[in-house]
Curated annotation (Swiss-Prot):
Residues 279-341, 666-803 form a coiled coil. GO terms for biological process: endoplasmic reticulum to Golgi vesicle-mediated transport; exocytosis; protein transport. GTPase-activating protein which accelerates the GTP hydrolysis rate of several GTPases. Involved in ER to Golgi trafficking and polarized exocytosis. One of its GO terms (molecular function) is GTPase activator activity. The gene is GYP5. Its main location: cytoplasm. This is GTPase-activating protein GYP5. It is found in: Cytoplasm. One of its GO terms (cellular component) is incipient cellular bud site. Residues 101-115 have a biased composition (Low complexity). The lineage of its organism: Eukaryota, Fungi, Dikarya, Ascomycota, Saccharomycotina.
Amino acid sequence: MVEAGAKISKGGTQQAAGHGLEGYASDGSTDLRSAGAAEHETQDSAKAQENEASANSMDDGLELGRRGQGVSPVLTPPTEEEGDAPAQKNRRQRLKERKATAAAAGALPGIGRARSGSVKEGGSPKAAGAESPRRGAGAAAKDAKISERAEGAGSPQQRKQGTGAAAPGSPPRRRLEAAEPPATPPRRKQAEGEQSRPEGEQGRPENKNKKAKDKHDDLPTRGPGTRRPQVRAVPPPLSEELKNEAFRKTLERVETVAPEVPLQAAEQRSEPSDFDLIINRLRVNAQEYMSQDEQAQENLQEGVRQLKSSYTEFLQTIQPEEKKKGDVEELDEEEEEMRKIDWQFWTSVVNNFATVAKNDSAKLEEKVSDGIPKQIRGIIWQLISNSKSKEIRQLYQDLLQIPSEHEKAIQRDISRTKFIPVDKTESLFNVLKAYSLFDPEVGYTQGMAFVTAPLLINVWEEADAFGLLIKLMKNYGLREFFLPDMPGLQLKLYEFDRLLEENSPQLYNHLIRLGIRSSMYATQWFLTLFAYKFPLGFVLRILDVIFVEGIESLLKFAVILMLKNESVLVQLKFDKLLDFLKDGLFNYYLKENVRKRQEGKEDTNAIQNAEVSDSSSKSSTVGSEILGVEYNINVFIQDAIREVKITPIQLRRYSSEYEEIHQLEFQREAQYEEMRIKNRQLQREVRKLEHDYTLLNREHIMLANELIQNRLKIETLNDENKDLKLTVDVLKRHLSDEMRKQTLPNPDAQIPTDLKEDLEKTMQRNLEVMNQNQELEDKVTALERQVKQLKKNRANTSVEHGEDSSSEPRVRSHIVTPSISSWTFKKPW
C-alpha cells in the first residue's frame, strides 16, 4: 500500500492515554483532519463509544495523528525504542497494551469527543477556558484554533492569532483529565484586542498570494528573536474518520507492516576475511568441512592425523643428521637449504594451520612466497585443503575399475606433458581417468594434465593426488575453468582486466585501443597454472600460493607480468604486441635479465627483445622444460605477492559487476534467441501462408476460368435459345398456316394471282431459251459436217496434184452451209 495514514509518536500516544489531551501534541504526530471534521465533532460520546469496537479492530500497526496544516499522511518511522533490535517487542502486543491503558483511564473513547463544559454559540473561546481552572490562556487559544479549523473558516492571520467564531450548535470539545501535566511546548496566548472575522468572511482568504501560507499556517513563525511553538490539534476518533471517503482512500494505501531492514544493513560489519586472501581461503575451507556429514568429517580428521604422523616421522629423520653435520663447514646445496628452513614455523603450521593463518597471516604469506619445503610440500597441501580421506581412497580404487570414454584423449595429452617423469606417466593416466569418471560434467579437458602432474609428483600415492585434484576443482573453483562454457575462466579474465585497469590504466587503454583482449593471450595462464610456459619448479611455487590463498592468487602472477613489461607493451603495435604477450612476456624473469637488473645493467633495448620474441621464446621454452633453471622463481613470486594487492571484497565487487554484465548479456542473448525463434516461426508461417496463398491463387484462377467459360456457355446457350425460339415461332406460324389451309375447301384458291403470272412469264422465257439453244445446236451440227467435207476434199486434192501441190501452203477453208434441218419445239410438260 502506498504511504498514507498518520502516526502518533510513541511518547505522544502514551501521554494522551495516561495524562490527558495536552500530552498528545508531540512532535512525531501528524494531522489527518478531513474536510468533514467539524461534522464529526458534533457526535455525542455515546456514538463514539458505540464505534470504539470498530476502531479497535483496525490494523494495530497504524497510529494516526494529525498535523495542523493537513498534510498528506506518511508512515510512522520506528522510534529509538522500536528500532533497538534487542528491546524490540511485538508491535501488536504493544499497541494492545496502550489501548488497555487508555481504556482504563477513560481516554481512548474520548480522544475525539467533546470536552466537558460548553462554549456558547457565538461565544469566545476564552469563555470556555474560564470554566475550567486547569485550562489556561494557552489551552483556550488552542480550543479556539480547533474550532476555527473544524469550521474551515477564518483567515490565515486569524488562525495564527487563535481567534475565530465557533460553529453554531457545535458542542465544545472536552479535554481529558490528566494526573500530572505533560511536558508540552508553551502555547502563544491570544493577544488582547484581537477580533475574529465576521461569519460571512470566514473561509475567504485575505489574499491569493497567501494560499501557500495557509497550508502551513500552524507551523511556527520565525522572526527575529522570537519562535512560535508548534501546536497540534487532536484528531477525531478513528471510527469517525473512517466515515470520510477521502480518509478511507488514504488509509487503503497505507503499508500496515513496517518495512524490513535490508540484509545489507545487517552485513555492513567488516571481517578479516574481506581483506586477506589467506583468511578468506581458511574460511571457505572451514565452511566446506562443516558442510559434510559426521562420517566424512571423521575420515578427514583421520587423514589429518596420518599427515601429522608422517611429518613427525620426517622430522625425526632429519634432526639427527643436522646434529651430526653441525660441525661440518662445507655442506652441499641441498643440506644448506635444509638448514635455512624454519622447521619450527612449519611445525606450527602442521599442528594448527588455522591458528597460524588467523594470527600471523603476514608471516605465513612471506614463508609461502619463499616456497614450501619440497620435502613436506605434499603434506602441507593436503593439510591446508583437507583432502586426505580413506573415503576418497576407496572411491579412487572403485573408479579405476571402470572404463572411461576419455582414455584416448588422456593418453594423447600425456605425451605432450614433458616435465612429468616416465615412471609417473601411468599414475597420471589413472588419476585423470578416475576424475573423468568422478565428474562426468567436466570429464576430461585439455590442460588438466598440467594441473595434475605437479600434484602427483609431491604425494606418495595416487589416491592422495586424486584427493588434491578434487579439492582444487570443487573447493578452490578450478572446476569452473573446465566446464563447457568456462564460466570461471571468463570471470577470472574479467577480474584480470579490472585489476589491470586499476593498476595500469595506460597499459589497459593501450590494449583496448588496439583491440587486444585478455582472452587472446591469458587463457592458457589460468587453464594450465602457467605450466605450459614455466618449468615444473615454477608451477610448484605457484601451487604453494594457490593452496594457501586460493585460485585468486593467479591474478597476482598475471598482473605482475603485465606491469613489469608495461614500458615495452605500450610501445608495440598489434601484431608484435600479441606475439610478445604470448611468448616474450616471461623473458623479464629470466635469470640473466634479473641478474642484470640487480647489477644495475638494465636492458635498454626492450623493443628489440619484443621483436625477436618469436624465435627466442621457443628455444627458451624448450630449455625451461628440460633444465628448469632459466627463470628466477623467487623474484617472480615475491614481486607478485608484494606489489599486487588483491582483497576478497575487491574480487566480490568485480564478481558482482561481472554477474550484472553477464546477466544483462544473458537477458539480451535470451531476447535475441527468443526473437530468433519467433523469427523462424514467423518465417515458417510466412512460407506456409505463401504456399497456401499459391494454392488459393491457383484455385482462384481455375475458378475464374471456369466462371468465364460458364459465362461464355451461358451466352452461347442464350443465343441458341433465342434462335430456337425464333425457329419455334416460324414453325408455329407454318403450322398454323398449314392447319388453316387444311381447313379450306379449295386448295388452289389461296394461290396468289401474281404468282401465276410470274410462272407464265417464266415458262415463256424458258421456251425462248430452249429455242435459241436448239438453233445453236443445229449450227454446230452444220459446222461439223462442213469440217468433214473439207477434210475429204483436201485429201482428194493432195492425191491429184502430187508433189507440186505438196509444197504449197495449206489453206483452210470453211464453208458454211445452211442447216437442212430445222428446230422443233417440244412441250416442256
